[in-house]
A protein has these predicted regions:
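Bacterial Sec-dependent N-terminal signal peptides
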Residues: 1-34
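Long, compositionally biased, intrinsically disordered segments
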Residues: 29-271
């Protein structure tokens, strides 16, 4: 039996990631979003390269990639102090790897990736910074969210004040997660991250952030933090995203063990 595993969001240190559902829609605000990553690299001094990896459903007739992607800058008191934009860089189609003989891979699974990057200089700040990007929507077919057609995403990274003195960079994940699993079959996959500075990373299941709505699909500027988590549907939670199925993550290694039972599209968060 076919099962779609969809990792909706990951918050790890100052790193945020989201992989959302592959769903078709006829409305521009709807489920073209498949997900995204956001992280930064310190280039020296107060200069940073900001990277956002945005994923969308190739076959969706919803909105395309944003031609201009807005990023809002807040200080540590959650007050907006700046904003910058990144033009659309073009996209590539990702390979969907699936070699389980339980089912033939459906032909309607296709993911595009666009990597938005910009180099910015930020002045020293005693409170640090939060950079945010928000977009809606995930799509009506996500199984474990209360109102997925009105749930968007927030990509957020925090640059602490200590980063300016030591030129710190944020963590980022090394593997694109699987999009397709088979129900009733256990699978393990490596969902670990790397930190360029060698900082210790600890993993746990958590609730993804929402962001935007069907009324305001692309907030510009983004709303200030703190951000609200998604609203789970009945019988689901951050630590029980599969309902009757099982999902665990090793807090040290980042290895995920999944045993889905009911077919569907599932939101799963890792912090």
């Amino acid at each position: 039996m076919l099962f779609f595993f969809v990792k909706l969001e990951v918050r790890l240190k100052r790193f945020l990631s989201l992989i959302s559902a592959l769903v078709l829609s006829t409305q521009l605000y709807a489920s073209h979003i498949v997900g995204g990553d956001m992280y930064y690299d310190c280039l020296g001094g107060n200069t940073y390269q900001i990277t956002l990896k945005i994923y969308r459903d190739c076959l969706s007739d919803g909105a395309d990639f944003d031609p201009i992607l807005p990023v809002t800058v807040f200080n540590g008191l959650n007050v907006q102090i700046d904003q910058f934009t990144i033009p659309y860089p073009g996209s590539v189609t990702l390979d969907v790897l699936f070699d389980n003989p339980c089912i033939t891979l459906p032909s309607d699974i296709c993911v595009e990736e666009a990597i938005y990057q910009k180099t910015v200089t930020l002045p020293d700040s005693p409170t640090g910074y939060t950079l945010s990007y928000q977009r809606c929507c995930r799509g009506p077919a996500v199984t474990n969210l209360n109102d997925p057609d009105d749930e968007g995403l927030t990509l957020q990274i925090d640059i602490p004040p200590t980063s300016f003195a030591v030129c710190n960079s944020s963590a980022r994940f090394t593997n694109y997660p699987p999009l397709v699993l088979c129900s009733g079959q256990e699978i393990e996959f490596d969902h670990s991250a790397i930190d360029p500075d060698g900082d210790l990373l600890v993993y746990e299941l958590c609730s993804p952030f929402g962001g935007g709505s069907s009324v305001l699909p692309a907030p510009d500027p983004a709303s200030p933090p703190p951000y609200d988590p998604v609203v789970w549907g009945p019988g689901f939670s951050a630590t029980d995203p599969f309902g009757d199925g099982d999902l665990t993550i090793d807090p040290v290694t980042g290895m995920v063990t999944a045993l889905p039972e009911a077919p569907g599209l599932y939101a799963v968060g890792v912090c």
